[in-house]
Amino acid sequence: MRKPKFETPDLTSENIEKIAALFPNCITEMLDEERSTPEKRVYKRAVNFELLKQMLSPDVVDGDEAYEFTWVGKKAAIVEANKPIRKTLRPCMAESKDWDNTENLYIEGDNLEVLKLLQESYLGKVKMIYIDPPYNTGNDFIYADDFRMESEEWKVESGEWSEDGDRLFKNTDTNGRFHSDWCSMIYSRLMLARNLLTDDGVIFISIDDNEQENLKKMCSEVFGEDNFIAQVVWERAFAPINLKKHFSESHDYILCCAKNLNAAVCNGLPRNAEANDRYNNPDNDPRGPWTSGDLSVGPRVESKVYEIISPSGRTILPPSGYCWRLDQKTFEKYKMENRIWFGESGDNVPRIKRFLADVKQGITPMTIWKYSDVGHSQDATKRLKDLFDGKAYFDYPKPVALIMRALLLYSSKDSIILDFFSGSATTAHAVMQVNAEDGGHRKFIMVQLPEPCDEASEAYKAGYKNICEIGKERIRRAGEKILKEQLANNNSTLNSPNSKLDIGFRVLKLDSTNMKDVYYAPCDYDQDFLHQLESNIKDDRTDLDLLFGCLIEWGLPLSLPYKSEQIDGCTVHTYNDGDLIACFDANVPESVVKEIAQRKPLRAVFRDSGFESSPEKINMFEIFKLYMPEDAGDITKRVRVI
């Protein structure tokens, strides 16, 4: 019987298997020091890296130097990204909004661990990621990752502590590993984030001058240099700070990379009246409004230098050093098709007609985003204060319009949008706003560490103990505001049967595994003690905790509908019309097993204590074999006991 592990995949082992498939001669064995004992030596598969390097090189490898970007702790960051964890996401209905109907998620917890838990459920499903990570200004909040060096120097350094006793490190410029710590923190998260993107997906990352250079190099490594799209300059300020000694910085950067540049599609910016006003139709051309472009171009190419006779009889040559854009044969064709314009008098220098109907609907974006178009920092702060009755509960939020522009450029109406440094939840606000304006059904996933608010802050005094509480309340208030505005405007997109605006969200919180420690280390207990254990599951875990733990284990989305019902005295949960059916009751009667099996779910799960004996478990599997389709395959992969 195959039991679920309830831990994220061991990516290191998976990567070794992939290498073995390509280069079997590069796989060897080495002593597994963690699992070996004095009585028994245990070996594990490993990669012969020297041989692998030679296999990938056309020349003899002899320690040649190569261009690379590295820092102290880079290898540890890679190990940290691949390391499995024993954690889960526990639902919190009390803090959610419209739990039963929403497809949005708000996840509280360290984003590195959350990204690991999302690897199976959202692999290749996220169309766009926007993140606004710490800028590493010397006082920014850095996550308590395992790659940090262990020494007395780091242990005594000032910092804050999480509720679990983990130090939440503030990266100061006196730290000898100032840039290294920041690079390690971001690198491991980018590695995991890339896996979640669709093939045509993109990521936007806000950053300032402190780490812009390093971030761009890391993105080139993680996403590939060929998948770089643009580095946008956002004009975040409109007035100088006179106290600055040299320059007053007025901009930040937004790095944009694709998972696969060849697959990514830019929608362009919406065309406005100003853009369309450049087109008119003075000659009543049946093809509609048009504008004209210069027919001459440089440098001069002799084959494209020829005389043009205007309708008025004037002979026209291109200017000195220039030639015509079209060769003579193509020009004559365009002239016959009425695509050449000599002016109303017929005596002007010829120009090429460009019709509005032929222009792509989206305007190609430029790399400078002005505050007049996407907002500035002060405007973002003001608008957030307006949501909270004039109170400033969050410093330096990003403008909603800024993220809306990114959404318009690279998301479609049914995309999943991820922000794993969600802060004040501006991205969630932007997703709801864009959906309200274009009738879309974009879904958001917000991830945020519950960083405690300063007890002297206005937010703490108002009852917000951590940033997550501010973010969730911001989504609630923004959603209600957007819905109210749309209803007041009688917006047609809200009146169609299938376009109900989703302003809800399911709250999930990162926690330890649902299983007791004995589940992972049975060798630590003798047989008599094992028999005394009634359940492998922790006492404080509910059916909903177990259900969502199974969703993560099986790689199912966490936002789909489910229902619970009573069958012969047992509670049965059906997720997304049969993707998974679960019963976590004790002593499950055969009638319930038969009823579940007859529904032919794709997956089914029971609690170990649901069966009093091994024969009962075997009988359960036999019942499923009886009712499952013949092509169902190995039943133990579809039916599990936890």
For each predicted feature, which ranges?
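Phosphate/ATP-binding catalytic cores across multiple sugar-kinase/actin-like superfamilies
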Residues: 111-114, 118-121, 185-190, 196-199, ...
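Conserved Class I SAM-dependent methyltransferase catalytic core
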Residues: 170-229, 465-487, 513
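Active-site-adjacent helix-turn-beta-strand microarchitecture at beta-sheet edges
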Residues: 259-385, 389
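Short, basic, low-complexity termini and linkers enriched in Ser/Thr/Gly/Pro
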Residues: 153-160, 486-500
